[in-house]
Structure formats: C-alpha cells, structure tokens
C-alpha cells in the first residue's frame, strides 16, 4: 500500500481549508490522456496553482489505480524538479463501489468520491458510511453523492430524460448526520 503522502500528494481537505482561509479556489480537473495531464502540470507550474486531479471512471477502468497514482507522482516530481512545492491531490471521481474506493486509497489517492446516488437512500447511506470509515483510517477525504443533477448525469448525452432526480434537500441533513 502506498500512502498518498509517500507519492508527494497533498490532503484534499487541507487544500480546501487553506484556499478558504486565503480566499482562492482550487481547480479540480479531469484528464483523459497523457497530453492533457502534461498540460495540467505545465499550467500548475506556470501559474503556481494547487490542483486536484480527477480520475474519471473511464480512466480508472482503462489504467487502474496504481498506474494513475504513478502518473500523478511523475507530475509531482516535475513540479519539484522546478524547485516548487505546489499542492497536488489525486481524486477518484464517481467511484461506484466500495472496492473502487478501497483500491484508490490503497494505491495512493488522497481523496475519493463514493457515488451511491443510484441506490435507495438507506443503501447509499450504508455504502457512504462504510467508505468514510475505511478512508478516514488512512487520512483520505471522502466526497459522496446524494441524488443526481439534471442533464448529462441522467442520460449520459447531456439531454436529460425529462424525469429529474434532483437531490431532496430534506434528505441532505439526514445523509450528512449518518
């Protein structure tokens, strides 16, 4: 198991805390190719900006967590090679199962998103709680999804299906408490 700090990554929650205190935003950017990854690292170096690198489900399936973590480590090495110490984190975006999140934590991701939004409320709560308990033992930040946004997430084509499944605001407080 590689802890994200061994790969040179920053804790996502710490990045958010500092950004909030100092009044700036941290970009969270998906990359789907090495060219995009290198362009992001070039921009991080040029702008001296922290970044959260998002590993999409497709990229995760294609490369796996270990290779993704090593790619990000190479970018962090490039940043350090320029004499810079800029926070970078690797985030599993839309992890659909507990095992996806475990794999990400085991191979050095500093944050994960567990997406149980397609599950009934109680199952989503249970899945999220299981993921949070595991990830927090490794100082890994967790994002969870409750409900879906109208549009692209519903149908995959950006058109929506006419039957929106917005997040129920009354469920949010209960979801967070549990």
What is the predicted function of each stretch?
Residues 26-30, 90-91, 113:
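Short catalytic-loop micro-motif centered on adjacent basic/acidic residues
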Residues 10-21, 34-59, 66-84, 94-178:
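Alpha/beta enzyme core
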Residues 2, 6-7, 16, 20-28:
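Terminal accessory/targeting
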